[in-house]
From Swiss-Prot:
Stated induction or repression of this protein's expression: By zinc, cobalt and cadmium (zinc being the best and cadmium being the worst inducer).
Compartments, as annotated in UniProt: Periplasm
Location of the region described as Disordered in the Swiss-Prot/TrEMBL record: 93-115
Keyword Signal on entry: yes
Protein name as it appears in the record: Cobalt-zinc-cadmium resistance protein CzcI
Amino acid sequence: MRRFVLIFVLLILPFQFSWAAAARYCQHEKATATWHLGHHEHRHQQPEGKTDAEKKPFVDTDCGVCHLVSLPFVYGQTQDVLIANRVEVTDTQHSSEFSSLNARAPDRPQWQRLA
């Protein structure tokens, strides 16, 4: 049974990876002849009356759900780019030596029968 499951996973996983990669290319196509492997009609479902300013500044990831949720998480979604690009520099120079270092060799046992 384990062999059957392993063979099944080894056959399905590459197909799923290629399907998810192809899904990124077919999103939001406007052409009339857009049928190919993995293509589906994309419908935005949002409430009426929202302006462009009220829309979320995220990548549309609901297509990835249709394609087994593989690739949309590769594209990191951040709301504020300035916060995401902030890098804190730390001082890598140590000003003091480590005080816990004991450079001596370990002592030999003082008992005759354990030596």
